[in-house]
Design a protein with these regions (language model features):
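Helical subdomain adjoining the active site within ATP-dependent kinase catalytic cores
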Residues: 1-29, 33, 114-122, 127-130, ...
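Glycine-rich ATP phosphate-binding loop
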Residues: 63-90, 156
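Conserved structural core of kinase catalytic domains
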Residues: 121-176, 234-241, 246
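Protein kinase catalytic-loop region centered on the HRD/HxD motif
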Residues: 186-197
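Activation segment/activation loop of eukaryotic-type protein kinase catalytic domains
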Residues: 202-256
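Conserved end of the kinase activation segment
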Residues: 255-270
Length: 385
C-alpha cells in the first residue's frame, strides 16, 4: 500500500487504478489518492486529523439542515456542515465501516478541492455527533471557499434551486448557463473517474457562494454538495438506500423510484447521469423541476372533464413528460447540441450502462464513462453564445 502511495509516475498510477476494478478495492483507492497528490496538496491520511472534535465548533445547529458556522484550530475558519443521519449501534463493526466510508469521502473531497474541474468544497474532516437526538448524525465539514474579511459582509450560500426561483436575481445569460452545465457535467465525470457515486444530485445540492451585500452572485462557479448517500462503486461498500422524498424523487431514475425496484435495484452510474439530465433541463428552461411538475399537474386538471374528480398524477407519467416534451422544448432555447446531451442523460445512458448478459457490470460502467465524456462533457464544451 505504501509503495503505491509513493508512486509518482501518472501512467503507472492509471494502470493500477484500472487494475483495481478487478483487484482489491484498497489498491484502487491508494492509486486514486496518489494520483490526486501529484497535482494537489498533501492529503491528511491520518484518521485523527479528519475526526474533528465537537468543542472546536462555535455552534452546530439543532436539526439536519445544512449549517454555516465557525471552526477553530489555531485560526478561526468559516465552515459549512452537511449532516448525514445514521441509526447504527455504537461501537459496532457496522459503525466503523460507515465512518470509514465517510472518512474516505472526506479524503477524496479534500484532495480534489485543488482541482477546479471537480467543483467540490475543501472537506476539513468529519464530526461524529453522537449527542444529537433522536439519532446520531455525522457531519462533513467544508471550508467556505471565499476569504472572510472581519470588516466585510458575511459569506452567503445559496443553491441552484434558490438561484432559479429568486425573483430578485437576474436570469443569467445564455453563455453563463452553458458554462454552468459544462462545469456540472465535468464535475460528475471527475467523480466517476474517482470511482464514486453521488446518488443525490438535485438543484438543492448545487451550491453558490457570494459576499455581495444584496446576495447576488454568478452561476458559473457551482459546487457539488449533498453527499448524503455517496459511496465508492465497490460492491463491498456499505450502501444507504435513499428514502422516498417527493422533491428528490423528481431527479431520480425511474428504476430508483418505482415501488417494485427502488429498495432492491443496485445503484449504477447511469442513475447519476439521469439526475444530471434533469438538472440540465432546469438550466436550459431556467425553471425548477418542482415548478414544472406543478404546472404539469395543473395542465392535467384543466384537461379533465369539468366537475369530475381529478385522479392523482403518478410520478411515472411526469417522468415520461420530462423525457419527451421538456427535452423537445430545449432545442429552441439551448440548441441541438445541448438538447442531444440531455437526451443522452435521460435515454442513451441507460443503454450504455445497461446490465445485459453480453456485457458485464464493470465493462458496462466503463463504457458509460467513456460515452458520457464523449457525448455529454465534450459536446457541452462546444456550446457557445
Amino acid at each position: 500500500m505504501q509503495a503505491i502511495i509513493a508512486e509518482s509516475d501518472p501512467n503507472r498510477l492509471l494502470e493500477i487504478q484500472r487494475a483495481g476494478v478487478h483487484w482489491r478495492k484498497a489498491i484502487s483507492v491508494a492509486a486514486s489518492v496518489a494520483a490526486l497528490q501529484q497535482v494537489s496538496t498533501p492529503v491528511p491520511l491520518s484518521t485523527n486529523q479528519l475526526m474533528l472534535p465537537r468543542a472546536r465548533f462555535a455552534s452546530l445547529g439543532q436539526d439536519m439542515a445544512r449549517y454555516q458556522t465557525q471552526y477553530t484550530h489555531g485560526e478561526v475558519t468559516e465552515v459549512l456542515i452537511e449532516w448525514r443521519a445514521y441509526k447504527i449501534p455504537p461501537n459496532s463493526e457496522t459503525k466503523i465501516t460507515y465512518l470509514n466510508t465517510c472518512l474516505d469521502l472526506a479524503r477524496l473531497l479534500h484532495a480534489s478541492q485543488n482541482l477546479e474541474t471537480y467543483r467540490t468544497l475543501d472537506c476539513l474532516g468529519i464530526l461524529d455527533d453522537v449527542e444529537f437526538q433522536p439519532h446520531s448524525r455525522v457531519g462533513l465539514v467544508y471550508r467556505v471557499p471565499l476569504a472572510i474579511s472581519p470588516t466585510g459582509p458575511p459569506v452567503k450560500v445559496f443553491t441552484l434551486h434558490d438561484f432559479i426561483n429568486r425573483k430578485e436575481l437576474a436570469r443569467p445569460p445564455l453563455d453563463e448557463r452553458f458554462e454552468l452545465a459544462r462545469n456540472l457535467a465535468t464535475a460528475l465525470h471527475r467523480l466517476f473517474a474517482s470511482r464514486w457515486y453521488h446518488k443525490n444530485l438535485n438543484s438543492k445540492n448545487i451550491l453558490f457562494f457570494t459576499q455581495a451585500v444584496d446576495g447576488t452572485g454568478s452561476c458559473i462557479q457551482p459546487y457539488l454538495s449533498g453527499f448524503d448517500y455517496a459511496r465508492p462503486d465497490s460492491p463491498d461498500e456499505m450502501t444507504l438506500k435513499p428514502e422516498a422524498d417527493e422533491f428528490c424523487d423528481r431527479y431520480r431514475h425511474p428504476q430508483c423510484t418505482h415501488p417494485d425496484s427502488r429498495s432492491t435495484i443496485p445503484f449504477r452510474r447511469r442513475f447519476d447521469v439521469y439526475s444530471l439530465g434533469i438538472l440540465l433541463i432546469e438550466i436550459g428552461r431556467w425553471e425548477t423541476v418542482d415548478r414544472i411538475h406543478k404546472d404539469y399537474i395543473a395542465q392535467k386538471a384543466k384537461a379533465a372533464a369539468k366537475g369530475s374528480v381529478v385522479a392523482p398524477v403518478p410520478l411515472e407519467s411526469f417522468q415520461r413528460y420530462l423525457r419527451t416534451r421538456c427535452v423537445e422544448s430545449l432545442a429552441f432555447r439551448m440548441g441541438t447540441i445541448y438538447t442531444n446531451a440531455v437526451k443522452f442523460c435521460l435515454h442513451d445512458a441507460t443503454e450504455a450502462g445497461g446490465d445485459t448478459p453480453a456485457v458485464s457490470v464493470v465493462d458496462g460502467e466503463q463504457e458509460l464513462i467513456s460515452r458520457f465524456n464523449r457525448d455529454v462533457v465534450a459536446e457541452l464544451a462546444k456550446c457557445t453564445a
